[in-house]
Swiss-Prot record:
It comes from Xenopus laevis (African clawed frog). It is found in: Cytoplasm, Cytoskeleton, Microtubule organizing center, Centrosome; Cytoplasm, Cytoskeleton, Microtubule organizing center, Centrosome, Centriole. Residues 375-391 have a biased composition (Basic and acidic residues). GO terms for biological process: centriole elongation; eye photoreceptor cell development; negative regulation of centriole elongation. Belongs to the POC5 family. One of its GO terms (cellular component) is centrosome. This is Centrosomal protein POC5.
């Protein structure tokens, strides 16, 4: 910092009249002692001591207070002189009554001088003011106060001198001590101020350095930004120049392209005009040619179409006639076949009626014989085995309904059965077979089946022969099986007459060898042990051993006398 600032900011020195300091208190005490010995109190009126005391107190207060203006001091002296005036006037009136002498006037002047000298000990200012006041009062011809002479001894003056010497010495020492203290305090304050200023200076330097660094950073950033801006400006100017060049090129290209399109449009319009002109000429020429050749061309086309249509019609008529003849011949054949089939159906229906009646009669006879001799017969002949029977052709007949369509179908089946061999039906169905035990409900509702086995050499007669019958408890529960065996000798005359009359009747209506009728009741569910016991009872096993030989003889005789066995099976 500069020297001017240090001078302005110098510390303020303490006042010499501060209360509580050592110098001021010592001086005050010495000053009081001086007033005791040096001040001579004149003998005034009763009010003068109080006024003098007040005046001295004001002087003391003025010493300890701040210095006042000279105008105020003069006003105080005037007030003091005016207050003393009435007392002086009172004394003067008393003296006028007695005229003064010259000695008395000299005494008064000496007292006045001593008074003024005593006042000068207090303060030269006040003494001057009083002298001025006295002069003014003398000038105004006011009588002065008569003060009696105050004698001061020499001892007191010596004491005052000693006291003043002591006071001046102590004042000097105290003033020097205070000055040294002030100097030290000033130096310390100056050092502290310098230290604070150095710290502030260092802080300011650091702040300024940081600001300088920041400003340098900002400067660098501004420089880089300015460089970038310059680059951007240069790039933009370069781009603008290129864009201007491009725009110029585009402008020239568009002008050239517009000229080219205009030229092409003119060429195209010219070509269209030429094409239109040619088309109009061609249309006119075609109309003229068409009007000339239209009549001849139409006639020729009509003749050609008519000829082609006639040829097609002739071909179609020939084809249809050939197809019609073929269909007529086929229709005649079909009608002849229908007539033949109808005749065959009539014959078949007659033979079926005869066979059905024979079966019904045999069934009735067997049923009557079964119910009559059921309890009397205990033994029976066992039926022959399946292996001993000779295979013979068999025909299966199905009971036809009454309608004509089914009769024709059954007649056709009979013809096919005559020409094709089928398996032989056995003459006897064993009573203990599994069919009697586990037959289903569908078999219970099946229609009647008639099986016939014929031979070309012999025809059995209608003579009834005795036949064995077996009825078991199982058969009585599950269903009823009626086995009928009819044996007859061949009747040659009857066979020859039937062969000569009709082959179909001979094949269909031979004498019946055996009829098997089954009447099934609802099937009962049995266990395996019950079915085995029902299949092989004890009575059947015992009778099979006793009748084995006789059955073999009978089977041999039957095989000799019978060429075939016919069986009818009726299922209710």
């Amino acid at each position: 910092m500069s020297s001017d600032e240090e001078y302005r900011e110098s510390p303020i020195l303490p006042k010499d009249s501060d209360h509580g300091s050592s110098v001021s208190s010592d001086l005050q005490d010495e000053y009081d002692e001086l007033l005791r010995y040096a001040v001579v109190t004149p003998r005034f009126g009763p009010h003068f001591p109080e006024q003098n005391q007040l005046f001295t107190e004001q002087i003391k207060s003025d010493r300890f207070s701040s210095p006042k203006d000279p105008v105020q001091e003069q006003s105080l002296a005037r007030n003091y002189s005016e207050e003393n005036i009435p007392e002086c006037s009172a004394t003067s009136t008393s003296q006028r009554r007695s005229p003064p002498t010259a000695n008395e006037e000299e005494r008064a002047m000496s007292e006045k001088k001593s008074f003024l000298s005593g006042l000068e000990a207090f303060s030269p200012l006040h003494s001057e003011d009083l002298s001025l006041g006295g002069s003014t009062s003398s000038g105004s011809q006011v009588q002065q106060v008569r003060v009696k002479e105050l004698p001061v001894p020499a001892e007191n003056m010596d004491k005052v001198e000693d006291v003043l010497d002591l006071w001046s010495g102590t004042l000097k020492t105290n003033v020097m001590a205070e000055l040294s203290k002030w100097r030290l305090t000033v130096i310390e304050q100056h050092k502290l101020e310098i230290k604070n200023q150095n710290e502030k200076h260092a802080e300011q330097i650091s702040q300024l350095s940081s600001q300088i660094d920041k400003l340098q950073d900002h400067l660098q950033t501004y420089e880089t930004s300015i460089q970038r801006k310059d680059e951007v400006i240069s790039n933009l100017t370069h781009a603008l120049e290129k864009h201007k060049e491009k725009m110029e090129l585009m402008r020239t290209f568009t002008h050239w392209r517009l000229q080219l399109t205009e030229a092409r449009e003119e060429d195209y319009a010219r070509s269209l005009a030429d094409r239109h002109y040619r088309n109009t000429l061609m249309k006119n020429a075609w109309k003229a040619w068409h009007s000339v050749i239209q009549s001849n061309w139409k006639d020729k086309i009509e003749q050609a179409c008519r000829a082609r249509a006639e040829e097609v019609c002739i071909e179609l008529s020939n084809d249809y006639e050939s197809k019609l003849t073929q269909l007529n011949s086929a229709l005649g054949e079909a009608r002849a076949e229908v007539q033949r089939l109808l005749a065959e159906r009539g014959q078949f229906e007659g033979s079926m009626k005869k066979a059905f009646m024979r079966g019904v009669c045999a069934l009735n006879m067997e049923a009557m014989s079964m119910f009559q001799g059921r309890e009397s017969r205990m033994e029976y002949d066992p039926p022959p085995r399946r292996e001993e029977r000779d295979p013979s052709p068999s025909v299966t007949f199905q009971n036809p309904p009454v309608t004509s369509t089914h009769t024709s179908s059954t007649q056709h089946e009979l013809q096919s059965a005559l020409h094709s061999p089928v398996t032989c039906e056995p003459n006897y169905i064993h009573a203990f077979g599994p069919s009697t035990v586990s037959q289903s409900k569908e078999e219970a509702g099946a229609p009647a089946v008639i099986s016939a086995a014929t031979s070309a050499s012999s025809v059995l007669s209608t003579q009834k022969l005795p036949m064995p019958r077996v009825v078991t408890s199982c058969q009585q529960k599950a269903g009823k099986i009626i086995t009928a065996r009819i044996s007859a000798r061949p009747d040659v005359s009857q066979r020859s007459s039937k062969i000569g009359s009709n082959i179909t009747s001979m094949a269909v209506s031979p004498p019946i060898s055996s009829i098997v009728v089954e009447k099934h009741h609802p099937v009962t569910q049995q266990t395996i042990s019950q079915a085995a016991a029902a299949k092989y009872p004890r009575s059947a096993l015992q009778s099979a051993n006793s009748v084995g030989g006789r059955s073999t003889g009978q089977s041999g005789r039957v095989s000799q006398s019978h060429a075939g066995i016919h069986s009818i099976k009726v299922v209710d």
